[in-house]
């Protein structure tokens, strides 16, 4: 795990340390925010009540959160709860989308170029979440639990009230629901795990963190 963490830190330093690369990534993020928000979720947003909007554009919103979080981190203005929120969103919705397209392809038997583009872009979204997850820093258990609670509430809104993302004829609401439940549970457990809280606190305070 120590070697993996060193790789993650190296990638983070490379991206944030080179302005051209950093801002290119942020522009790509914002293109995803606009395209996904308008093309994929636009019709649903128009037909939904305003209170539900924060729960609807899952991946575009995650990309927006990531962009803001990365900019704050690069300019030494981190907001730990927001970094955790963005990391959770990117990992949850990135992995959910990868599962979504994998299930669709297995059932449909065909793969379209646009679908491949979406799959690859959500690998990137997931990776952004991993990078942000290593930069949470000083964040108490209550704030962590609230972040996990929000994404648990989003499951209720999506699948209990019918505001879940558009699905294909292959991907059923049951599959989508249980994928969301599993991802939220695993990420929530990770975020609130005492050993993770202690390790991230120690790093933020500049203390030595043992790595294998």
Tell where the protein language model's regions lie, with residue ranges.
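Juxtamembrane "helix-exit" motif on the non-cytosolic side of transmembrane helices
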Residues: 36-45, 98-109, 158-168
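N-terminal membrane topogenic signal
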Residues: 3-26
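Non-cytosolic membrane-interface motifs at loop->transmembrane helix junctions
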Residues: 47-54, 108-120, 169-177
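Membrane-interface helix-boundary motifs at transmembrane edges
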Residues: 12-16, 72-85, 134-142
């Amino acid at each position: 795990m120590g070697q993996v963490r060193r790789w993650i830190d190296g990638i983070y330093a490379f991206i944030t340390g080179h302005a051209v690369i950093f801002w290119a990534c942020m522009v790509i993020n914002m293109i995803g925010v606009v395209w996904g928000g308008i093309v994929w979720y636009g019709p649903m947003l128009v037909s939904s009540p305003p209170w539900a909007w924060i729960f609807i554009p899952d991946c575009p919103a995650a990309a927006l959160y990531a962009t803001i979080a990365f900019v704050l981190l690069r300019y030494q203005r981190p907001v730990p709860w927001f970094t955790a929120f963005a990391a959770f969103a990117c990992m949850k919705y990135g992995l959910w989308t990868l599962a979504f397209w994998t299930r669709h392809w297995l059932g449909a038997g065909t793969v379209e170029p646009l679908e491949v583009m979406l799959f690859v872009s959500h690998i990137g979204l997931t990776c952004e979440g991993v990078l942000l997850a290593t930069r949470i820093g000083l964040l108490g258990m209550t704030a962590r639990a609230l972040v996990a609670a929000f994404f648990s509430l989003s499951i209720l809104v999506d699948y209990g009230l019918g505001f879940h993302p558009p699905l294909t004829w292959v991907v059923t609401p049951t599959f989508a629901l249980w994928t969301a439940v599993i991802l939220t549970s695993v990420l929530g457990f990770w975020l609130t795990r005492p050993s993770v809280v202690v390790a991230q606190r120690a790093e933020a305070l500049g203390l030595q963190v043992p790595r294998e």
